[in-house]
Swiss-Prot record:
Organism: Ehrlichia canis (strain Jake)
Quaternary structure, from the entry: Heptamer of 7 subunits arranged in a ring. Interacts with the chaperonin GroEL.
Gene Ontology BP terms: chaperone cofactor-dependent protein refolding
Protein name: Co-chaperonin GroES
Family annotation (NCBIfam families): PRK00364.2-4
UniProt family annotation: Belongs to the GroES chaperonin family.
Functional summary from the UniProt entry: Together with the chaperonin GroEL, plays an essential role in assisting protein folding. The GroEL-GroES system forms a nano-cage that allows encapsulation of the non-native substrate proteins and provides a physical environment optimized to promote and accelerate protein folding. GroES binds to the apical surface of the GroEL ring, thereby capping the opening of the GroEL channel.
Pfam families reported for this sequence: Cpn10
Record's subcellular location: Cytoplasm
Disulfide cysteine pairs (residue numbers): none
Length: 94
């Protein structure tokens, strides 16, 4: 991976939450967006009012849960990712 995140941005690879073997095929617009993913890259954090950097609480490799409509989808090296602010992450697996 040759992609570096800036500020408090987090790069996430979405994880599918289970495949249905249903014969009914929904269009992409009707499918629920993933809300679980694996952290691929994190930025260094943001600066507070004193000029000190606030470190990130999320680490590469962690599995996280995030808001359904959070972030922006990007494509890098023929793979799709989601870039979001750390504050859009609501939990991580312990």
């Amino acid at each position: 991976m040759n992609l570096s995140m800036l500020h408090d941005n987090v790069l996430i690879e979405a994880l599918e939450e289970g495949n249905s073997n249903s014969p009914i095929q929904l269009p992409d617009s009707a499918k629920k967006k993933p809300t679980k993913g694996k952290v691929v890259a994190v930025g260094p954090g943001v600066y507070n009012s004193n000029g000190n950097i606030l470190p990130m609480n999320i680490k590469v490799g962690e599995v996280v849960f995030y808001r359904q409509w959070a972030g922006n989808e990007i494509e890098f090296n023929d793979k799709k990712y989601i870039v979001m602010k750390e504050s859009d992450i609501i939990a991580k697996e312990a």
